[in-house]
């Protein structure tokens, strides 16, 4: 018999010499090819969905800051751009991202920024697909991460958070694989040094690590009881955990602002909790998903998909519970990031990444439990038999999903995807048309114009800063880590008086400038 027509045999543990015929090598090669095509379809769709016109405002003050850092070889420690808070401390943990963004912009303008953003989001999804659900068919993993990709691309703006999403995916993948390869834990301190100097959400890495430590401790204590899986023999010992944990703490301090930088996430958490009522009605991304859904209904595909993904992840815990199995690590992760996601729209993306991981890992564990149960009985495990009918059904499923993903990717090129998602955007690698007030900012920056400006939109203030800062300053911009709540109130009151034609706005401005130390 020719070699290519031979069938392979696999021995089932506990069955002695019993052999089971499985799919021949030729069919397996076809299966691998279709699985690769499926992953390529997902990553292609993710990249194309990510390439939408740039419409975030914060990128302009990020770019200006990066340019100034490269020109002056110095980092900001006090405010560079406003006259109302000119003496305020500025803990700018974004400086790493800002340098990268400024260099990218210098090399290829907005087009290259959008392409790099798409590449980073696609990398995040790729890490998720390859790192989670080791026991799952490729079709299921791609299906789950397709949902995640829709959520991520719905908020695919050029900001430091796109780096945080990728770092979060790497961190989660490292923690998942560290039980069998504890040497991977040594990668975390260097990653933390990079993360803490790019975005304040480096704290996500600490949250994930804390959840993992609690899980390891409880599984060690349970020794296979209480529905907790036994620890693998290769799991890191206490000495390694203490050393890595200490290095992570030190890594958080390796930033230009030392302990202020390490503790800066607490400032953000205050806005998330104590000051939530104030900021949620003034800043769109601080709005809760429930409030946003109440405003627009079912018109946002990305929000609907985020809700479906969360419900599936939550249901997977219930399904796992029917097998008397609990994962403390995944449970704590899900609760922590669900809390963040329910609080603010801006947190939907990291919550989606965690939900995707939880869903894949929970289903993967269910598959493994079923295999163990079947292997302990007289029947050959269903997953190992793979009858031809099931195999070809799976092939058809993979081909169908690939075609759908390629079709949805193509729909973004025609504009249909934008109408479906409610965003209305078409594939583009430039700025959103008539979105930024570049010409007005340049006009107001001409010689003879005032060196201080009041920009009625603190988003557009970033555009003014990009063209005219830091020699010309604005009353307030979108850097809520610099501009205080009191400044925000003065800003709103001044704009209201100006709109009403009340000259009393000048008195308010004078009072604000006096409080800010500006003469």
Regions found by a protein language model. Give the residues of each.
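Short periplasmic/luminal acceptor-recognition loop of GT-C membrane glycosyltransferases, typified by
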Residues: 445-486, 519
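Transmembrane-helix signature of polytopic, membrane-embedded enzymes
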Residues: 40, 128-151
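Membrane-interface transmembrane helices that cradle and orient dolichyl/undecaprenyl
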Residues: 171-185, 315-322
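Membrane-interface alpha helices of multi-pass inner-membrane proteins
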Residues: 46, 148-153, 174, 185-200, ...
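Transmembrane catalytic cores of multi-pass membrane glycosyltransferases
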Residues: 58, 70, 200-324, 358
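Transmembrane-helix motifs of polytopic, lipid-linked glycan transferases
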Residues: 115-135
């Amino acid at each position: 018999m020719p070699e290519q027509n031979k069938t392979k045999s696999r021995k089932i543990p506990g069955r002695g010499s019993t052999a089971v015929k499985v799919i021949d090598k030729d069919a397996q090669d076809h299966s691998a090819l279709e699985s690769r095509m499926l992953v390529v379809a997902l990553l292609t769709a993710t990249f194309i969905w990510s390439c939408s016109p740039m419409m975030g405002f914060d990128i302009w003050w990020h770019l200006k800051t990066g340019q100034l850092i490269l020109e002056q070889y110095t980092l900001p420690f006090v405010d560079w751009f406003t006259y109302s808070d000119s003496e305020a401390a500025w803990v700018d943990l974004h400086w790493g991202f800002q340098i990268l963004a400024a260099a990218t912009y210098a090399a290829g303008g907005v087009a290259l920024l959008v392409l790099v953003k798409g590449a980073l989001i696609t990398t995040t999804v790729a890490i998720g697909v390859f790192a989670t659900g080791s026991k799952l068919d490729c079709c299921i993993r791609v299906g789950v991460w397709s949902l995640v990709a829709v959520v991520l691309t719905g908020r695919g703006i050029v900001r430091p958070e796109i780096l945080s999403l990728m770092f979060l995916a790497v961190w989660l993948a490292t923690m998942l694989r560290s039980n069998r390869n504890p040497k991977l834990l040594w990668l975390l301190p260097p990653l933390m040094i990079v993360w803490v100097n790019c975005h304040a959400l480096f704290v996500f890495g600490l949250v994930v690590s804390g959840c993992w430590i609690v899980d390891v401790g409880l599984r060690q204590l349970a020794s296979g009881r209480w529905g907790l899986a036994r620890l693998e023999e290769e799991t890191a010992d206490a000495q390694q955990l203490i050393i890595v944990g200490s290095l992570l703490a030190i890594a958080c301090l390796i930033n230009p602002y030392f302990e202020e930088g390490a503790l800066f996430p607490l400032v953000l958490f205050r806005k998330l909790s104590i000051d939530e009522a104030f900021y949620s009605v003034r800043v769109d991304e601080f709005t809760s998903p429930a409030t946003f859904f109440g405003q627009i209904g079912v018109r946002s595909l990305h929000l609907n998909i985020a809700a479906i993904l969360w419900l599936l992840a939550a249901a997977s815990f219930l399904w796992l519970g029917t097998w008397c199995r609990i994962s403390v690590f995944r449970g704590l992760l899900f609760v922590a990031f669900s809390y963040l996601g329910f609080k603010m729209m801006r947190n939907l993306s990291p919550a989606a990444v965690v939900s995707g991981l939880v869903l894949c890992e929970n289903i993967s564990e269910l598959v493994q439990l079923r295999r163990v149960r079947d292997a302990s009985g007289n029947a050959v495990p269903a997953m190992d038999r793979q009858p031809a009918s099931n195999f070809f059904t799976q092939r058809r499923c993979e081909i169908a999903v690939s075609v759908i993903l390629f079709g949805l990717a193509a729909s973004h090129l025609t504009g249909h995807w934008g109408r479906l998602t409610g965003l209305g955007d078409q594939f583009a690698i430039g700025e959103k048309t008539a979105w930024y007030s570049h010409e007005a900012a340049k006009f107001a920056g001409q010689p003879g114009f005032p060196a201080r400006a009041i920009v009625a939109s603190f988003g557009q203030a970033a555009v003014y800063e990009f063209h005219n800062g830091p020699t010309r300053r604005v009353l307030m911009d979108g850097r809520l880590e610099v501009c205080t709540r009191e400044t925000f109130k003065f800003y709103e009151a001044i704009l209201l008086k100006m709109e009403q034609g009340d000259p009393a706005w000048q008195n308010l401005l004078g009072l604000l400038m006096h409080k800010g130390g500006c003469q």
